């Protein structure tokens, strides 16, 4: 059922109500019966998963299990292995996470399954162990002889394993993709399990192995820890309570007075902490995990924080803490089964560089039992977008079951789904892969939906419902009883709440940062800092500015932006990179490899690995266009003040030429699905998408013009790729200098730019009066492009070469590795390689 392989279930991809449910296997039973009746289908209703014992007559070579979290999938697997493992049986287990690998080997050992080795403990790089647990990224380390000889292939969390193909840490995509495909095609016995196994995976296996060789188990048992759980999505975070408690304002010296407040995330959290409850808190962002821990510390010092900056601890230690705060570092493979925590709180912030909703869903399921069976969730939509570029694609399936969405809503969202499907079909077309190409739709869907608040909530609710968790909308009741109008009103309230608290949250995070006065890294870290500065920065940067750069790089989104800025500058300095892919590839790998030193809020240095994208051809096409735009607009982020002013007509002209191709390119590179101008720029679509995504004021605003659409697209690309802000200029004249600060030379330059004769003017006053009499010539709308503060220190333009001799020398050294034939031959130049 792949969108690029003539799927048999094509109608699902055009259905805004069915799409999410189908992608996560909600329609698997009916789909198999209708499309693949030859597949053996077993329904296990309200009982834990049970696998057919090896050797029984019903056994088939491939077993696929779809079952919710907490249904006993891994336990059933262990029992199966205990019966299957004879002395001569070889087994390969492919894991999706390092933590999952460690959990599996522990459970295998506890179950008495001997002989298993993990890639983590292997003393050799190439592995040929008879029984091996390996993470997908390391699959290329398994010897070719071993790959072809394994008797049993186990893919626990199979959809997560396939999802790892799209991870930025996947460095050998083609090799790993080919090996996994080979295993699926040849291994004599396969067990694949996941809570979200879908028809797309079944279709793949059917094509490889044949329907007659597949047994599919669909289990509905979710366990009492999930089936009795209620998840309430709150309308308000309660930012006032957070500020009062953290800053200890006089009116709240005694935090016990908070018990009078109810209904918001922090009010409810404070109430339960005051009552002595044990609370687990999931946060989809690192910064909020630290902030909420600071809030909880007012009530108790028994707090465990698990995030990317802190060491993990054994899951059995969790019971010793009143409060557990964790991020997506706690995911599949880690489960806490004790009845210790009363309630769970969840803060979820959909954003382009954050975890997708499947990762959030998996992390929410790590605590298996809650004494009060309640999850209180706040979804922060401050980083999601509305029109004119973004439109929600999904209509909630649960609501559609009881109420009818308006026909206009259905028709428009179905059209958007079709447009998305077509864009997916055109993506990664040069990727020489089997699985990566086949499952790209699901990956792109999960990443692109993070730009939409409504889509993110719809996907999360679909996943929670598959685990029999009832979702309740604050003030409205169970989502099963909510009408379409009520649901859209709730999305509107959430968006309004998030926008209201965004600046306050930003201020709190900044206050939480330490003021660094000491800067003296030594040893290994000092060497890394020196290497980074010589590679990317100009030598004129002082120590204070260095600290600011390293602190900025602690934010994950700023790291690729700095790399992109350096690459763009190199492409402008070396125009051959825009003509020859090999030259661009060398520039790209030079800057997009290695490490970044980052400075966290505690003043500690750490290393962040720079990841290289697999689809460099797409990156080349994108940077070719961005370089042309930057040169045309004369954009230089390293100018004084990091500000460039451009005419809106210039932006519009450029994006009339390149807008369509840029939309497809950023779809692949940035995982950003921009709604086509031909679709969004008409009244029914404009009003409907605004209503569905909670932007109700959009319903009453005029439809944007193509000109405004182009400006918005430019703003998006420059912000996401380079961290630049594009805003309307309010200055009378071009440039960063205010009118009262203009010097005589500035006045002359401005008059010359509009071809005004100034020969009769001798004094400053005369020039000023002449300029003001012609100020109508500067009335055209201009935009300011403000680069981030760190950008002024990045080596960007050729005239800065003397300020960055090391950076230039390092790049030239990398380029010297290219053969003469890699450089473009233009204007009749001789091909010396052929002589």
Swiss-Prot record:
Chain residues that bind ATP: 67-74
Record key words, sorted: ATP-binding, DNA replication, DNA-binding, Host nucleus, Nucleotide-binding
Localization in the cell: Host nucleus
GO MF assignments: ATP binding; ATP hydrolysis activity; DNA replication origin binding
Gene Ontology cellular component list: host cell nucleus
Tree of life domain: Viruses
Any GO BP: DNA replication
Quaternary structure (record): Homodimer. Interacts with the major DNA-binding protein. Interacts with the helicase/primase component 52 and the polymerase accessory protein.
Reported function: Functions as a docking protein to recruit essential components of the viral replication machinery to viral DNA origins. In the presence of the major DNA-binding protein, opens dsDNA leading to a conformational change in the origin that facilitates DNA unwinding and subsequent replication.
Name of the featured protein: Replication origin-binding protein
UniProt organism field: Varicella-zoster virus (strain Oka vaccine)
């Amino acid at each position: 059922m792949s969108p690029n392989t003539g799927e048999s279930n094509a109608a699902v991809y055009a259905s805004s109500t069915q799409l999410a449910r189908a992608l996560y296997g909600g329609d698997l039973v009916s789909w198999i019966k209708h499309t693949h009746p030859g597949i053996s289908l077993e329904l296990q209703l309200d009982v834990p998963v049970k696998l057919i014992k090896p050797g029984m007559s019903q056994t088939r070579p491939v077993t696929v299990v779809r079952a919710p979290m907490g249904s006993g999938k891994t336990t059933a697997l262990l029992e199966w292995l205990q019966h299957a493992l004879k002395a001569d049986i070889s087994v390969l287990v492919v894991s999706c996470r390092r933590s999952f690998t460690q959990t599996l080997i522990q459970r295998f050992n506890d179950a008495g399954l001997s002989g298993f080795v993990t890639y983590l403990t292997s003393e050799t790089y190439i592995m040929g162990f008879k029984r091996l647990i390996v993470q997908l990224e390391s699959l290329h380390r398994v010897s070719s002889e071993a790959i072809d000889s394994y008797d049993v292939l186990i893919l626990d969390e199979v959809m997560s394993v396939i999802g790892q193909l799209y991870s930025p840490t996947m460095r050998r995509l083609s090799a790993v993709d080919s090996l996994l495909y080979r295993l699926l095609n040849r291994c004599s016995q396969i067990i694949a399990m996941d809570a979200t196994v879908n028809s797309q995976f079944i279709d793949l296996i059917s094509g490889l192995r044949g329907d007659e060789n597949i047994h599919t188990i669909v289990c509905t048992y979710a366990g009492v820890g999930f089936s009795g759980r209620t998840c309430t999505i709150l309308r308000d975070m309660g930012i006032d309570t957070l500020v009062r408690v953290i800053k200890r304002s006089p009116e709240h010296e005694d935090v016990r007075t908070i018990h009078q407040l109810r209904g918001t995330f922090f009010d409810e959290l404070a109430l339960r902490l005051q009552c002595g409850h044990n609370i687990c808190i999931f946060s989809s962002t690192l910064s909020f995990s630290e902030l909420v821990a600071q809030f909880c510390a007012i009530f108790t010092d028994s707090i465990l924080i698990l995030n990317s900056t802190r060491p993990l601890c054994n899951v059995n230690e969790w019971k010793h803490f009143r409060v557990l705060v964790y991020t997506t570092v706690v995911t599949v493979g880690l489960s806490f089964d004790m009845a210790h925590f009363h309630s769970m709180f969840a803060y979820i912030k959909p954003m382009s560089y954050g975890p997708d909703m499947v990762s959030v869903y998996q992390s929410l399921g790590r605590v298996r039992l809650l004494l009060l069976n309640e999850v209180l969730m706040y979804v922060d939509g401050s980083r999601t977008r509305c029109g004119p570029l973004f439109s929600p694609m999904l209509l909630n399936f649960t609501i559609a079951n009881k109420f009818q969405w308006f026909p206009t809503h259905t028709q428009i969202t179905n059209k958007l789904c079709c447009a998305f499907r077509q864009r997916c079909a055109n993506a990664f077309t040069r990727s020489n892969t089997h699985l990566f190409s086949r499952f790209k739709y699901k990956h792109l869907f999960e990443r692109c939906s993070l730009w939409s608040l409504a889509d993110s909530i719809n996907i999360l609710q679909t996943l929670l419902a598959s685990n029999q968790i009832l979702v309740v909308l604050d003030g409205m009741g169970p989502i099963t009883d909510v009408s379409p109008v009520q649901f859209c009103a709730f999305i509107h309230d959430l968006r309004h709440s998030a926008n209201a608290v965004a600046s306050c949250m930003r201020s709190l995070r900044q206050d939480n940062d330490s003021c660094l006065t000491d800067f003296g890294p030594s040893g290994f870290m000092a060497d890394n800092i020196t290497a980074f500065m010589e590679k990317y920065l100009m030598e004129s940067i002082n120590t204070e500015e260095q600290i600011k750069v390293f602190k900025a790089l602690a934010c994950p989104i700023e790291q690729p932006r700095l790399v992109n800025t350096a690459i763009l500058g190199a492409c402008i300095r070396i125009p051959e990179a825009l003509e020859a892919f090999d030259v661009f590839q060398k520039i790209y790998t030079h800057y997009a490899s290695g490490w970044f030193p980052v400075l966290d809020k505690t003043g500690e240095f750490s290393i962040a690995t720079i990841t290289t994208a697999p689809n460099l051809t797409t990156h080349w096409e994108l940077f070719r266009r961005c370089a042309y735009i930057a040169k045309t607009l004369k954009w230089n982020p390293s100018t004084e003040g990091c500000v460039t002013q451009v005419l809106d007509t210039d932006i519009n002209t450029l994006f009339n030429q390149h807008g369509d191709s840029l939309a497809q390119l950023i779809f692949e590179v940035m995982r950003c699905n921009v709604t086509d101008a031909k679709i969004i720029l008409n009244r029914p679509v404009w009003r409907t998408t605004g209503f569905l995504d909670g932007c109700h004021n959009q319903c009453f605003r005029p439809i944007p013009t193509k000109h405004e659409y182009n400006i918005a697209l430019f703003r998006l690309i420059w912000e996401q790729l380079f961290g630049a802000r594009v805003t309307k200029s309010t200055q009378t004249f071009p440039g960063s200098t205010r009118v009262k600060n203009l010097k005589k030379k500035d006045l002359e330059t401005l008059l010359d730019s509009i071809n005004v004769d100034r020969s009769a003017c001798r004094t400053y006053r005369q020039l000023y009066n002449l300029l003001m009499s012609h100020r109508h010539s500067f009335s055209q709308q201009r935009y300011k492009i403000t680069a981030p503060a760190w950008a002024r220190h990045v080596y960007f333009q050729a005239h800065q070469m003397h300020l960055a001799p090391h950076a230039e020398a390092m790049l030239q050294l990398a380029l010297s590795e290219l053969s003469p034939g890699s450089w473009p031959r233009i204007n009749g130049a001789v091909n010396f390689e052929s002589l």
